[in-house]
Amino acid sequence: MEPSPAAGGLETTRLVSPRDRGGAGGSLRLKSLFTEPSEPLPEESKPVEMPFHHCHRDPLPPPGLTPERLHARRQLYAACAVCFVFMAGEVVGGYLAHSLAIMTDAAHLLADVGSMMGSLFSLWLSTRPATRTMTFGWHRSETLGALASVVSLWMVTGILLYLAFVRLLHSDYHIEGGAMLLTASIAVCANLLMAFVLHQAGPPHSHGSKGAEYAPLEEGPEEPLPLGNTSVRAAFVHVLGDLLQSFGVLAASILIYFKPQYKAADPISTFLFSICALGSTAPTLRDVLRILMEGTPRNVGFEPVRDTLLSVPGVRATHELHLWALTLTYHVASAHLAIDSTADPEAVLAEASSRLYSRFGFSSCTLQVEQYQPEMAQCLRCQEPPQA
């Protein structure tokens, strides 16, 4: 069957295999999906256009990165290069100045480099298709990279905290105020440059493609919720935190430069900035643990999803409802829908899938439709999970 010219933007897939051509189920399935008469299929089934409610939210994306992701990758490359160069400079400057505060700032930059490299690696992996072993693809590589970045920051910060404690106990150390002031000033400039690079606007988003990273809501009073590129946004917020820390180190270096007797400001600021650095990892660690523990996606509640499914005409009950996230923006849902005997399973499936996609922005939904049985009300496995 040749696809209709008006069916632009629909997903290309296979309807039936050659061995199903003679089956009545395949004919009924085709008849329920298309209104115009279909021509006999050739010996080998050809890919044809499928309507939205077949099973997927979006058309099959083109191979490679979208323009938005390409722009995000360029931003991350530039910011990562700047961050690495100035991190190396801070390590050298901190060593020459004998400043733990500078080293703490360099450790924070090290975490930034690791985070951005993990984001770049995940952007590259996201172009690889799913396999029979990795059926979900490689989406969680970004989560693992974020976890590695947090662990590395904790290790380096722990060492610096120990050294700062030793310095407070024993005052036999000397701070080179000039070298510390110069290094801290360069660090502030580096963070300003990285913030400028990451804050640059990307190309205009394209409609009808998931690469634009928009979570469409239902048409009505609410507007589409722009998500942007999560990796770039996270890096930008992280750089803003580094900028505040760099200003603090700069203030401590100015004090030590003009008042060398106040050299204790170096280990004291190391304590303060280490606490800030560890605290900044709390949101990332919370998101990582929630994803790895198969928790519900952030900003998606169990009750709203359940109520949305129960509001579909013909649905009497729902059970086995599971919501989880592969990444912060790739959300998945699965559920069993118990329907009335008079309800059309195809219509219920199409309507329920459409509501989940449009209202919550799920990337993948798997729904099983079954006849409602009275004993489901007493079945323990059909009950809702308790509130956490």
Swiss-Prot record:
Zn(2+) binds at residues 108, 112, 238, 242. Its main location: membrane. It catalyses: Zn(2+)(in) + 2 H(+)(out) = Zn(2+)(out) + 2 H(+)(in). The chain crosses the membrane at residues 76-96, 106-126, 146-166, 178-198, 236-256, 265-285. GO terms for cellular component: late endosome membrane; lysosomal membrane; neuron projection; plasma membrane; synaptic vesicle; synaptic vesicle membrane. Keywords: Antiport, Cytoplasmic vesicle, Endosome, Ion transport, Lysosome, Membrane, Metal-binding, Synapse, Synaptosome, Transmembrane, Transmembrane helix, Transport, Zinc, Zinc transport. Residues 1-46 are annotated as: Disordered. Pfam families: Cation_efflux. Residues 97-105, 167-177, 257-264 are lumenal. The keyword Ion transport applies. Residues 1-75, 127-145, 199-235, 286-388 are cytoplasmic. It is a multi-pass membrane protein. One of its GO terms (molecular function) is metal ion binding. GO terms for biological process: response to zinc ion; zinc ion import into organelle; zinc ion transmembrane transport. Disulfide bonds: none annotated. NCBIfam families: CDF. Homodimer. Homodimerization could regulate efficiency of zinc transport. Interacts with TMEM163. This is Probable proton-coupled zinc antiporter SLC30A3.
